[in-house]
Amino acid sequence: MKERIVNLETLDFETSQEASLRPNLWEDYIGQEKIKSNLQVSICAAKKRQESLDHMLFFGPPGLGKTSISHIIAKEMETNLKITAAPMIEKSGDLAAILTNLQAKDILFIDEIHRLSPAIEEVLYPAMEDFRLDIIIGSGPAAQTIKIDLPPFTLIGATTRAGMLSNPLRDRFGMSFRMQFYSPSELALIIKKAAAKLNQDIKEESADEIAKRSRGTPRIALRLLKRVRDFALVKNSSLMDLNITLHALNELGVNELGFDEADLAYLSLLANAQGRPVGLNTIAASMREDEGTIEDVIEPFLLANGYLERTAKGRIATPKTHALLKIPTLNPQTLF
């Protein structure tokens, strides 16, 4: 499948740009109000006690600000933030090297934490509970365990698949937060703030239009903003007005609902099944896409907005999908 403009993965060239647009203070961080409120209380209490924060887990679809909110937490706690990803921690020695380099009250952010191997989790448990690292030297009857004390630290785990976390690991997080999709009005504010940082003039209705097509996700909103800015530059316009914005978004293949070719292909597959559940493996084979991408990238927004139902037997299109695609729902009796 070709590269999607609404793809939720962070592209290499976007990393430095994302950092420049990232909010640095709570007042700059838009959305996730309940999470912000709870975190502000926890941070204030931890600072008064002069302790590290409890370990915390952020889960939800990609692109909703898990990393950004972790940067703000570290800034508020006046401490260091170390960032890594579970696939990079292949051996217990990799984790030991990270943990032994932490200072008191530092924050360790592990992305895709559901991908940690069971062996790595076993090393992590005493580190989280007792701030202790148990290193096994040797093997068999001659094996010895060396205990290394660690400074108190905070582990922030981020995952798009909370259900894949083992129960022992999940239970060791003192706080757990589900990141929600953003409203169009919240996304419009994010877009206008980002445009100002980019020194780009943008009309209110243009920001609203981009927000409407951003699938409730800041990462997509910022990506669309930058692509529309490119169209404005090519047209020698210093202002992103509605005409340029509509032209750019249509050229990018993102419709009024934020759907692209992949979304519509997915929904068409379900709708044409006429009420029969379609298995994930069948969908993946038909779309030539891996199952993880379908579950983590395509489905969450469609599911949250009522375009499909997940059942034990598979996925089913809702009446909303049939109405969108203008595919009539057949009477079940006519299917047999």
UniProtKB/Swiss-Prot annotation:
Gene for this chain: ruvB
Segments for region (Head domain (RuvB-H)): 256-336
Location, primary (coarse class): cytoplasm
Span list, region Small ATPAse domain (RuvB-S): 183-253
GO cellular component: cytoplasm; Holliday junction resolvase complex
EC number: 3.6.4.-
PANTHER family in the record: HOLLIDAY JUNCTION BRANCH MIGRATION COMPLEX SUBUNIT RUVB (PTHR42848:SF1), PTHR42848
Species of the source: Helicobacter pylori (strain Shi470)
Quaternary organization: Homohexamer. Forms an RuvA(8)-RuvB(12)-Holliday junction (HJ) complex. HJ DNA is sandwiched between 2 RuvA tetramers; dsDNA enters through RuvA and exits via RuvB. An RuvB hexamer assembles on each DNA strand where it exits the tetramer. Each RuvB hexamer is contacted by two RuvA subunits (via domain III) on 2 adjacent RuvB subunits; this complex drives branch migration. In the full resolvosome a probable DNA-RuvA(4)-RuvB(12)-RuvC(2) complex forms which resolves the HJ.
Enzyme superclass (EC): hydrolase
Record protein name field: Holliday junction branch migration complex subunit RuvB
Domain comment as written in the entry: Has 3 domains, the large (RuvB-L) and small ATPase (RuvB-S) domains and the C-terminal head (RuvB-H) domain. The head domain binds DNA, while the ATPase domains jointly bind ATP, ADP or are empty depending on the state of the subunit in the translocation cycle. During a single DNA translocation step the structure of each domain remains the same, but their relative positions change.
Residues reported in the UniProt entry to bind Mg(2+): 67
Record-linked InterPro entries: AAA+_ATPase, AAA_lid_4, DNA_helicase_Holl-junc_RuvB, P-loop_NTPase, RuvB-like_N, RuvB_C, WH-like_DNA-bd_sf, WH_DNA-bd_sf
Family membership noted in the UniProt record: Belongs to the RuvB family.
Residues that, per the record, bind DNA: 310, 315
Compartmental location: Cytoplasm
